[in-house]
From Swiss-Prot:
Any one GO molecular-function label of the UniProt entry: growth factor activity
The organism of origin for this protein: Homo sapiens
PANTHER family: INTERLEUKIN-5 (PTHR48491:SF1)
GO cellular component: extracellular region; extracellular space
Subcellular location, principal: secreted
Protein name: Interleukin-5
Gene: IL5
UniProt cross-references to InterPro entries, sorted A to Z: 4_helix_cytokine-like_core, IL-5
Subunit structure: Homodimer; disulfide-linked. Interacts with IL5RA. Interacts with CSF2RB.
Length: 134
């Protein structure tokens, strides 16, 4: 009986340890990355001959591929080491997060009514959060 109690407590402890999130929340990661970007801006602009394509419109969520290509270019031209490495590591984690979220865009066949609800929500976000150019 005593052994069963010990095993139960051990299992409960193991479950607790594995249930604690070990990753930093994405919102905190983004805040930290913004601070690092501000801190290392001078170092990052040291190469004034480097040209990186910048998306024209302001709907940033549509340009994630271009943004991360630019980050890759910047990283390959920046001297690595020290604290700037943390910036690029964070940016890589943010990209993984976005890529994971994009996988949720996978198609699932649903009824027309459900699609129209989704379309209405999409247009509502577009109407309130996107910068619509005339």
């Amino acid at each position: 009986m005593r052994m069963l109690l010990h095993l139960s407590l051990l299992a409960l402890g193991a479950a607790y340890v594995y249930a604690i999130p070990t990753e930093i929340p994405t919102s905190a990661l983004v805040k930290e990355t913004l601070a690092l970007l501000s801190t290392h801006r001078t170092l990052l602009i040291a190469n004034e001959t480097l040209r990186i394509p910048v998306p024209v419109h302001k709907n940033h969520q549509l340009c994630t591929e271009e943004i991360f290509q630019g980050i890759g270019t910047l990283e390959s031209q920046t001297v690595q080491g020290g604290t700037v490495e943390r910036l690029f590591k964070n940016l890589s984690l943010i990209k993984k997060y976005i890529d994971g979220q994009k996988k949720k865009c996978g198609e699932e066949r649903r009824r027309v009514n459900q699609f129209l609800d989704y379309l209405q929500e999409f247009l509502g976000v577009m109407n309130t959060e996107w910068i619509i150019e005339s």
